[in-house]
């Protein structure tokens, strides 16, 4: 049975003090309560009090997803302003110190902090998660296996976290370095079947490693409760249009890989050890790096590889109705990722507060506010 390839998009935002430009907790405001009145369960708190998350409805195509995520951003920007805050889409804050940030009062987060201690408290990061509807569990596993190869390229496009604790880190996605301190992160191994994956999960639960499968935080996973493959590798991009383009790319990749699987032409599987080399390069250099073409056993400029990647998925784009969204990736290759643009502002101004101001402007871009 053909998957639906429906879409769900989650974004995590920063709540900022407009005077200091530092992170500020939204918990003393009505932002979350008002958000739930307007958006119901599409908005929720996250582990730190200066993080707020939104999620789209189940969307039938990328244009429906665009409409939903734009609407969510608009609403959250207005809610932040109404409560004396500024909303920012960035995967790390340029200078905020996690030690100054409080954990949101919730038993689930208390348990994570109890288990992971400093690693959890310092996890002050903001991501983008994209769900693609793949109802057949065996197909979901095969698509997850093959998607692993493309995740470094997807991450490179999304990179948006070059600063940490007021320092230029030298990484385009420092968020990825922070998050890999958690257990059960990074790229997963490949699995021969859904039952093999299920056995892995059951063993972890049986041996008290986890109490539920949502604590498997890989860069891609079959979602334990939804009939989706969830891609979790991305930094949250600055612009909503970048989020839509990346979601469209993930959807098209899943569709292409399913078609290959149906034709008994599964994409070649490379070892996790090799794929992690490319992930490191994406984390470190973003779009400016050279990633490894394992087939050719050579380094290739990332922008060139993404061009080849776009050619690879091009034949499924018309049926998904995602041409406009996919074409925007070419613009992203020209303008650079959010990390590139943050660094450019810092080079020009030498002022991280100006970087925060730029991030706030970009968060609003294209939303007709």
At which residue positions do the language-model features occur?
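Helical (often loop-to-helix) elements that flank the catalytic cores of nucleotide-handling enzymes
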Residues: 106-113, 134-155, 238-251
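Coil-to-beta-strand transition motifs
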Residues: 123-125, 138, 224-228
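C-terminal accessory/tail domains of diverse enzymes
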Residues: 1-83, 112, 179-369
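Short, glycine/charge-rich beta-strand/loop segments that flank catalytic centers
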Residues: 84-101, 165-169
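Short, flexible active-site-proximal loops enriched in glycine and acidic residues
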Residues: 42-44, 80-93, 118-125
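Acidic, His- and aromatic-enriched active-site or binding-groove loops in soluble protein domains
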Residues: 106-127
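An exposed, glycine/acidic-rich loop-and-rim segment of catalytic or binding clefts
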Residues: 136, 144-191
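An acidic/histidine-cluster motif and surrounding catalytic segment
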Residues: 130
């Amino acid at each position: 049975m053909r998957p639906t390839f429906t879409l769900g998009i989650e974004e995590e935002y920063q709540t900022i003090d407009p005077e200091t430009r530092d992170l500020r907790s939204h918990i003393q405001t009505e932002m979350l309560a008002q958000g739930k009145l307007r958006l119901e369960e599409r908005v929720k708190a996250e582990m730190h009090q200066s993080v707020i998350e939104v999620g789209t409805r189940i969307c039938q195509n990328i244009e429906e997803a665009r409409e939903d995520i734009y609407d969510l951003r608009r609403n959250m920007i207005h809610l932040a302003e109404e409560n004396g805050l500024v909303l920012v889409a960035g995967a790390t804050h340029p200078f905020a110190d996690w030690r100054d940030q409080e954990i949101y009062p919730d038993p689930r987060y208390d348990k994570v902090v109890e288990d992971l201690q400093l690693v959890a408290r310092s996890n002050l990061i903001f991501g983008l998660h994209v769900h693609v509807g793949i109802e057949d569990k065996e197909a979901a596993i095969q698509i997850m296996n093959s998607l692993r190869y493309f995740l470094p390229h997807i991450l490179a496009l999304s990179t948006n976290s070059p600063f940490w604790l007021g320092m230029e880190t030298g990484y385009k996605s420092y968020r990825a370095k922070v998050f890999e301190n958690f257990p059960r992160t990074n790229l997963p191994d490949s699995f021969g079947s859904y039952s093999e994956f299920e056995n892995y999960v059951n063993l972890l639960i049986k041996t008290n490693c986890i109490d539920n499968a949502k604590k498997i935080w890989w860069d891609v996973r079959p979602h334990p409760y939804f009939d989706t493959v969830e891609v979790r590798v991305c930094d949250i991009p600055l612009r909503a249009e970048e989020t839509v383009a990346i979601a469209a790319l993930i959807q098209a990749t899943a569709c292409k890989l399913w078609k290959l699987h149906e034709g008994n032409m599964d994409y070649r599987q490379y070892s996790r050890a090799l794929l992690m080399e490319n992930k490191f390069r994406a984390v470190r250099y973003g779009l400016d790096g050279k990633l490894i073409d394992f087939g050719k056993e050579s380094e290739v400029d990332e922008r060139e590889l993404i061009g080849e990647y776009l050619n690879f998925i091009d034949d499924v784009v018309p049926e998904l109705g995602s041409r406009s969204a996919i074409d925007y990736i070419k613009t992203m290759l020209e303008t650079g990722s959010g990390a590139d643009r943050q660094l450019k502002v810092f080079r020009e101004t030498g002022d991280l507060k100006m970087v925060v101001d730029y991030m706030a402007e970009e968060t609003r871009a294209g939303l007709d506010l």
